[in-house]
Curated annotation (Swiss-Prot):
InterPro entries on file: Carboh/pur_kinase_PfkB_CS (IPR002173), DKG_kinase_firmi (IPR022841), Myo_inos_IolC (IPR030830), Myo_inos_IolC-like_sf (IPR023314), PfkB_Carbo_kinase (IPR050306), PfkB_dom (IPR011611), Ribokinase-like (IPR029056)
Protein source organism: Shouchella clausii (strain KSM-K16)
Single Gene Ontology MF annotation: 5-dehydro-2-deoxygluconokinase activity
NCBIfam families, per database record: myo_inos_iolC_N
GO aspect biological process, one term: inositol catabolic process
EC number: 2.7.1.92
SUPFAM superfamilies, per the entry: Ribokinase-like (SSF53613)
Keyword Transferase on entry: yes
Catalytic reactions of this protein: 5-dehydro-2-deoxy-D-gluconate + ATP = 6-phospho-5-dehydro-2-deoxy-D-gluconate + ADP + H(+)
Gene name tied to this protein: iolC
UniProt name for this protein: 5-dehydro-2-deoxygluconokinase
One Pfam family this sequence matches: PfkB
Keyword Nucleotide-binding: yes
Protein's job: Catalyzes the phosphorylation of 5-dehydro-2-deoxy-D-gluconate (2-deoxy-5-keto-D-gluconate or DKG) to 6-phospho-5-dehydro-2-deoxy-D-gluconate (DKGP).
Pathway info: Polyol metabolism; myo-inositol degradation into acetyl-CoA; acetyl-CoA from myo-inositol: step 5/7
Amino acid sequence: MGIQFQEGKQFDVIALGRACIDLNAAEYNRPMEETRSFTKYVGGSPANIAIGSAKLGLKVGFVGKIPDDQHGRFISSYMREAGVDTSQLVIDREGHKAGLTFTEILSPEECSILMYREKAADLYLSPDEIDAGYVRSAKVLLISGTALAQSPSREAALKAVSLAKAAGTKVVFELDYRPYTWSSREETSVYYTLLAGMAHIVIGTREEYDIMEGASASGNEQTAKMLFAKEPELVVIKHGVDGSYAYLPSGETFRAGVYKTNVLKTFGAGDSYASAFLYGLLRGYDIDQALRFGSASASIVVSKHSSSEAMPTLSEIKALVEEQHV
């Protein structure tokens, strides 16, 4: 049995958080110091998830803040053309810029990112820029962990969560840990713990949960038990090549393996996983089926150059799931 969502809402998913610029190395197998050409894409975990969800046919909205410049216009235009409602994409008028992420692809196993997040526009989304009616109009409100990293974005995210819960909207917390934005792991732990306890569904890697717990070696069952003492109804813990696990308060556990693919790079997998997993839940899939859907989507994205543009179609995911049984 899957998660139950309130019907009669305008949107399936509204994502809140960062929409920024990814500059992915166009030259493979060389360090960033020697890389001279990059390809520009829209990036940022919640933006990627929104784009991926829209590509799968969900009705998707986005809440965020972008700069009043060429990068901001590129982000807004791309997301709109991808099928995401951008009516709540606020334009920053105070000179803040888009976050920039450069990627390095040394090999399929060795990829890295370099982020520039100082005074990024998305972190200046304020509580008074949250439209209550808009937030209430979704079956799911997805919050990215990076939105909690600084004020006023932190307070805006928490306001949106309160509004959503009061309206029967399910809150999904995608941990999305990016050390460049936080002042310390201790600060991250405080705010992750706060929002994870308020969310209905929590999704993250084992390493991200360890940061939240301030632990170096916690077990999945311990993590799930801790969260089920609060409000979560479903906890998803990803273990990279070892697959992903989902836990219910009833004690039921589900697992999906990893689909074989020709890996080009490692980034983007989590965002594609989340969009396809949520698609499955919203379409009434059983949890184990939704896990496989997320895993298949992640495998497709890591075989391609971008994150946002590589988000797969429904037919691509279904074909891979039918081809391989994991």
